Regions:
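Conserved N-terminal segment of class I S-adenosyl-L-methionine
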Residues: 1-93, 99, 103, 113-116, ...
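Feature marks short, surface-exposed loop/turn motifs that line or immediately flank catalytic pockets
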Residues: 68, 138-140, 181-182
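A short His-aromatic
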Residues: 104-108
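A short glycine-rich, Lys/Arg-flanked "PGG" loop and its adjoining helix->strand segment in the class I
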Residues: 113-128
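Short, glycine-/aromatic-enriched active-site segment of Class I SAM-dependent methyltransferases
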Residues: 132-154, 158
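Substrate-binding/catalytic lobe of Class I Rossmann-like enzymes that use SAM or dcSAM, i.e.
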Residues: 167-199
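Flexible, glycine-/basic-rich loop-and-beta segments that form/coincide
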Residues: 190-222
Length: 260
């Protein structure tokens, strides 16, 4: 297929991207109580377990990578089913799940249209909900539509994502993922090309990267609280999802419903 699927978010809260990823599952948790869930590209399964804890009746996690599923099985995830599967050929019956989640997946696939059609096939056609996320091309700024991330095949501008999803779902709502005003900004998202960054933020981002490289892990939080007055890494609750931040959010989240 020419897809690039080896990029992985591990279940390691020392990673700067872990809590950002976990925040999406926190958002999805508000939609799963009393419902069956399919988590496509579940990785190590930490998010699938969180959805189960949020009251889902059943959660199945699918991923193409054996190493991720092996890690997931070692974690002993309670009541979460795991299966190796291709996102373009889901081993699930038509209309068999209430909610589909799939975070940071579509940018790895050459045929995004086929992926969305497959997701729509398996979700309940009357009350189904699909929650997806993908990097915002306004933030990542691919050159001539070629992503800078070597694992990404295509990155979507919000209007492109809306157009694609609207072909399959009567209701599509986009939200930009940003850090809360209380936290300030997320330094590892600040790059010289970032449209939302100021000179001060860029300089702080450079300083943060130096601190990350040079400071022992045991010092990072203390030094960050002293200098920046916040934890070194944002927690999942430091991220918010705002419909007014679609163009500036580093990540776009789409909430698609079969009922308008």
């Amino acid at each position: 297929m020419g897809d690039r699927v080896t990029e992985r978010v591990l279940s390691d809260d020392a990673s700067p991207w872990f809590m950002e990823h976990a925040a999406r599952y926190r958002l999805a948790a508000g939609y799963v109580a009393g419902r069956s869930v399919l988590d496509v590209a579940c990785g190590t399964g930490f998010g699938a377990a969180r959805l189960m804890d949020a009251g889902a009746t059943r959660v199945i996690g699918l991923d193409i990578a054996w190493d991720a599923l092996t890690t997931a099985s070692r974690l002993g995830l309670r009541d979460v089913g795991l299966c190796r599967a291709d996102a373009l050929s889901l081993p699930v019956a038509d209309e068999s799940v209430d909610v589909v989640t799939s975070f940071e997946t579509i940018e790895h696939l050459r045929d995004g249209q086929a992926f969305i059609a497959e997701v729509r096939r398996v979700v309940n056609q009357t009350h189904g909900i699909v929650i997806l996320s993908t990097p915002n091309a306004y933030a990542t700024q691919p050159v001539d539509n070629v992503p800078k991330n070597p694992y990404h095949v295509r990155e979507y501008y919000p209007e492109e994502l809306t157009s694609l999803l609207a072909e399959h779902f009567p209701s599509v709502e986009l939200k930009g993922q940003v850090v809360s005003r209380d936290y300030g900004y997320c330094p590892y998202w600040v790059t010289p090309a970032s449209p939302a960054s100021t000179v001060r933020q860029r300089l702080s981002g450079i300083g943060w990267k130096l601190e990350r490289r040079l400071l022992p892990d045991s010092w990072k939080d203390s030094v960050s609280r002293l200098i920046h007055r916040r934890a070194f890494y944002p927690s999942d609750t430091d991220f918010v999802f705002d419909s007014s931040a679609v163009e500036v959010g580093h990540v776009t989240v789409a909430i698609c419903k079969m009922q308008g």
